[in-house]
């Protein structure tokens, strides 16, 4: 179901149809999602229009996102026609999370350059692939505000890959001197076929809206129940260490997912929402949302290694050092991506690259 930013967009979509979000129930929300949601689950009868023929205007998408996030009682869309507005609101509702984002389908040319963008919540021709666009320049009150988050997330994508973490293909999309983060969907094949996906929170029955509701130990126990092979535990261990060292405190139960194939076999999804997410004064981001060894902060090297030992991780010492080495490239890679020096230095002061020395 839509959440956070998606609910804001849904509320505005309903408003355009002279309806109130207060008068719709959870079943109504599911019929609105219909066949357009993440993963493979579909809900019938679907209550939404499909228009796959129009091209997505990123500038208009950003403008709508900024307006609906502005908390204004009356929002004017005088420069956006009614059909475009409805389409923009629709593609912004079907993906979860707090940040402004949209589901899009992209057509690339032979040089791998974007030549056309269409709605990604429905099936497009075979020469399109399916992506999530995280919109730069909209107001994200929880995880940081203003422009520039797209570039920072891209740096974190590169750091995570350096740390041996499996990520979906990602890139920066520049538009009017804004830098949006694009990541390829792992719940769709290139042909648009759907792959069943469930979050850790959904499988374990844990509400992600409850702060500090879970632990990495619980995540690994769910993996055991799903009978995942050893290499996936090692992969998830790398992700755990990366979140700690790189200050990704947005490690709640919806930010870990599992994919199921047609034979019923589960695996962990590629890592996602891997980004700097730390604010000492933040309600959600002052500490981690998942604990290790009963702690949500102030971890020791012993905590991290003991956690690995409990779940049979081989060469945990070596893996920890590899992740530290990768995160230690923050300044170098951020400089290459043109992150402002002030931003680089501010994060350098709080990254935990020196906290776990032997």
Model-inferred region functions:
Residues 1-253, 257-358:
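Phosphate/dinucleotide-binding and metal-coordinating scaffold of catalytic cores
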